[in-house]
């Protein structure tokens, strides 16, 4: 039997992130392989995850949920399709010169002593595009941990952290299809940070610990779907609209009588790739 006590997201055959109802297995989850959407079978996450970013999609200067933009601008792009198939992508444009990462930030609850992964979706606009995506944790005054990603070479440019703020564990960029890339940055939070930043840069790293980025006043980057979660990997997208939100753990229960006996030499085969944070069956009951 299968159970999950919440909605969850998966990617369909068109490359659109869609919602799946509570208790419904995420069958037919697709992954972009660089040229086509491939059916990976069942997307199964046996660990609950919480997106700690209160507003994962609303970067508007009207609502001001995200921090002030004193040296950059941001605007929704009604003609751009975001990864969920809607039009909630924003264009972030840093002004000319060095930009502190106190731009486009939101407060999150990330107690020290834990591992956190920050992720977001980025895309280069059709013109005047920034090549570099930026993710950062900080205290909003230059004390932080930053990762910069190259959207042209599809690689991690650089990571940096204040030596007492965090330890860098990992950084990755994944092709999410339709020109979008999901970038993620994992740290061990040591002390003193409580905001996350999502942005872009004209250069792969600027200033001590890569804590600053740079703009030219005209080039921008499309952003969508900010997510910060406890854990050492990014999980499936969890949208938020005012407060943190949780995707429940998925549980597979296999009756012992239905598990093949080793003496029969009948293998248990998994078709497709499961996204497992805790591999293996959660429950084995009679």
State each model region's role:
Residues 1-286:
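Glycine- and acidic residue-enriched flexible segments with recurrent GG/GxG motifs
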